[in-house]
């Protein structure tokens, strides 16, 4: 209960949660994207508590949340321990599950499903169609395959964050752009990058699907 109360009051970065709604509308109202069935799914893979995120104002615009969870006492519904913690290894597992189209519940209850062999053309969201936003070293194992797979890795830092984290992200071509200050408001550098990345990816999907229909 206290986690849910905290989640409802969770302070968010500038521009959130309205930016999530606007980005989804940006994709859904583009005629070319609509005719080629291009959609935007938004996932959160976080070392924070899942219940807090689910209770936050972000939740209505999120398609999947992967975070730390508690084990509860059955009679009192009180937390009695940590059920799952999210390390950089877990972040990578969930990322590959999203790529392969394995639903969040299955990834939780049957973790070995992430090892299923999926042909490239059967991947639900290939790395080349991902935009991964990371803010620290634990995101590097996820940023690297996304960027090397043709997707976009965006480095972000909190307004009160340190330069060190951004510097670590930028080493070894782990990110495509950034790091930017976590400002998602229209007109900000971060928002311009996201708008451009969505436009380019959407048009690439549109052209690819149109080509396949013609051939």
Regions found by a protein language model. Give the residues of each.
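Short glycine/proline- and acidic residue-enriched helix-loop micro-motifs
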Residues: 1-7
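C-terminal cap/substrate-recognition subdomain and adjoining C-terminal extension
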Residues: 7-215
């Amino acid at each position: 209960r206290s986690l849910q109360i905290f989640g409802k009051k969770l302070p968010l970065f500038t521009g959130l949660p309205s930016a999530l709604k606007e980005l989804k509308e940006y994709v859904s109202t583009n005629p070319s994207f609509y005719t080629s069935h291009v959609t935007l799914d938004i996932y959160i893979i976080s070392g924070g508590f899942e219940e807090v995120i689910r209770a936050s104002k972000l939740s209505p615009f999120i398609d999947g949340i992967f975070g730390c969870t508690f084990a509860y006492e059955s009679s009192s519904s009180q937390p009695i321990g940590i059920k799952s913690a999210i390390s950089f290894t877990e972040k990578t597992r969930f990322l590959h599950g999203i790529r392969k189209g394995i639903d969040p519940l299955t990834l939780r209850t049957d973790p070995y499903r992430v090892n299923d062999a999926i042909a490239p053309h059967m991947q639900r969201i290939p790395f080349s169609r991902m935009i991964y936003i990371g803010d620290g070293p634990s995101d590097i194992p996820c940023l690297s395959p996304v960027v090397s797979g043709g997707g976009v890795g965006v480095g972000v830092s909190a307004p009160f964050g340190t330069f060190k984290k951004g510097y670590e992200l930028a080493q070894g071509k782990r990110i495509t752009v950034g790091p930017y200050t976590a400002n998602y408001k229209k007109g900000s550098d971060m928002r311009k990058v996201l708008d451009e990345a969505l436009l380019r990816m959407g048009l690439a999907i549109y052209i690819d699907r149109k080509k396949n229909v013609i051939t």
